[in-house]
Amino acid sequence: DNVIEELRRVVGHITKISMGETIRGTYGDYIEKKGRIAYFEPAVLTGSDEEGIEQELKIWAKYSKTDGGILEKIISYPPEVKLEKTLVLIKPDSFQELSSKVGNIIDRFSQTGLFIIGAKVIHMGVREAEEFYAPIKERLAEKMKGKLLKEIRSSLQGSLDFKLPQGIEEGIAEELKSYKTEHEFNKIIKFMTGIDPREVLDEEEKEEVREKCLALVYQGENAIMKIRKVLGETNPEEAAPGTVRKDFGLDIIKNGAHASDSSLSAEREMRIIQIEKDDIPEIVERHYGRIN
């Protein structure tokens, strides 16, 4: 409700006085010389009424195919720089309530000095999430065996009045490993999509979406290493102070953000989420009818 008024309030008016209470008051610039505007940087553009917003969105949709997309070959780098691109996903829990968490996470990544060359809100379905996270399933299996072994030993300790033969606990852990892995993997998929994959009955439901993420493409020298250093360890408890996961994560699933671990992973992940697909005309036409 009142989305236009609320956005205008947060963005703020054009002003020569930087008060820091609005986006423009913090990040905008307004300079006059001899009574005339010499420089104006609004920081953010937002619509003032429904009619104007419709016109502006139709302009965006009209030119998004030619002027939008990933900003390749826009930024000039020294010839010796070996460029890398990497993908960051800010996870669904950051969008489940009104907060500045997303902006704070992006601020933290800005410490890398890398450029954002692409940004897109995405909605993962079960099929897409399963493909995206497939590589971690094997790694999960080995982790789960060790975790299961601890749980089995803890559960059996003191509950039996005889000593188990050597290797029995390891055998039980090996037998249960695949079930535990599937259980943990399904928790990740449910978190990213809002849908429990065990409850999906047909292929159509695998395309359904309920949650959203923000996908960001960063570019620069050693982009993958720089982003992952700021991101921190998977488990927030093990992450270094000042990292995204230490400061914004709750557990190994709700840990703030995902980042690609190699150039090949970045390419694969960007392909899966279709980061370069232009959705703007479709979305605008769905709400306002034909663009032209």
Where are these regions (language model features)?
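Non-catalytic terminal and connector segments of soluble metabolic enzymes
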Residues: D1-N292
